[in-house]
Amino acid sequence: ERSRGLGDVYKRQLLMLCVILAASLFAFTGCQGNVQNNGKINIVCTTYPQYNWIQNIIGEESEEFNLTLLVDGGADLHSYQPSAKDMAKISSADMFVYVGGSSDAWVFDAVRETVNKNMKKVNMMELLGDRAKEEEVVEGMQDDEHGHSHTASEDSHGEHEETDEIEYDEHIWLSVKNAEILVQKLTDVIKELDTDNAEEYQSNADAYIKQLSDLDKEYESVISAARLKTVVFGDRFPFRYLVDDYNLDYYAAFAGCSAETEASFKTVTFLAGKVDETGTKAILI
């Protein structure tokens, strides 16, 4: 265990050295187009929702920004590891936006080695505050460590040790209500970076938040009229925030940030039984 721990330390040190060297290269060559050599504001986002929200906030002023998305569509956020080039982009950013959940363990090393010491570091889970929810284990969910499904009795009596570190569900963007809050928080930071166009950014944000609010009302209308209010999900369940927003029940193979991907026969059988019991038409994946 000790040798493995030392190996991890050496790997992190090597990665940080690569970051510093790459950042220096970009600084000397001007390839990255940072704020020092082209007057633009560099914003780096780890995931698409942040990226898309900021696109809507900056609107017609997009030419004032270099907006970068690190994790491309289709990539698994849970297993993403940045390249040296990605780390260099982060290092010279004026604003770095990340989720702040368990999948972002690499972020904290990255921000410690930033070239731009005035960087705005935006942790979305921190912005969300008390609305961030703990990872939840419900009846029938397959356990990561022990390979069995939880029963209703285990869930109600809290079989997990109390000393376990609390893990928060990082899928915060899968809630329209959360999106409304986060768009405004991101707007506030962008207005600090470009005070000359602050009114335009706020106007763009207000219009986009109105669209989100309208979508939220549509969700509420459709769900309130629905006969069935239970979701059965045959994979990791990322929709904790959404189901809580609209008082839906759910069963799933794994918790949202589970390392498991292969459901056991017992788990599949349990979910199939819940489809019959609740009258839902299918297991979603």
Q: How would you name each of these model-derived features?
A:
Residues 12-33:
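Sec-dependent N-terminal signal peptides of Gram-positive bacterial secreted proteins and lipoproteins
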Residues 1-13:
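Single conserved hydrophobic/aromatic residue that forms the stacking wall/gate
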